Amino acid sequence: MSMTDNVADMLTRIRNAYKSKLINVSFPSSKIKISILDVLQKEGYIKDYITTQKNNISYTEVALKYSVNGDASICEIHRVSKPGKRVYSPIKDLKGYYNNMGIYILSTPYGVMSDREAHIKNVGGEVICKVF
């Protein structure tokens, strides 16, 4: 069975893993998923990730991050732009998510980046997801 939205599947697996208080979560790997994980790691939402090969299929394993008292570092993670309805935004229309406590992850001509980095580079793009 083929998946229509691999990114939404990854975000759902991460969200469910945090709700279940898991330490790691794994899923099939792709370039866009790795780019999104780079942004999440740079912004401090996940600890680390590694990519491994099993039976000629690439898998990514993500080490989830929790606070000292056991709270998840990600409270919300939602897909914005979907295969059936793409959402594009100029940077001036992206106001701070949750009063700048959360981020939008964008796919821009300069690569996948957070809204903070996009504001610095003054570039908009497709809004992949929002994280808080």
Curated annotation (Swiss-Prot):
It comes from Rickettsia massiliae (strain Mtu5). One of the primary rRNA binding proteins, it binds directly to 16S rRNA central domain where it helps coordinate assembly of the platform of the 30S subunit. Belongs to the universal ribosomal protein uS8 family. This is Small ribosomal subunit protein uS8. Keywords: Ribonucleoprotein, Ribosomal protein, RNA-binding, rRNA-binding. Pfam families: Ribosomal_S8. GO terms for molecular function: rRNA binding; structural constituent of ribosome. GO terms for biological process: translation.
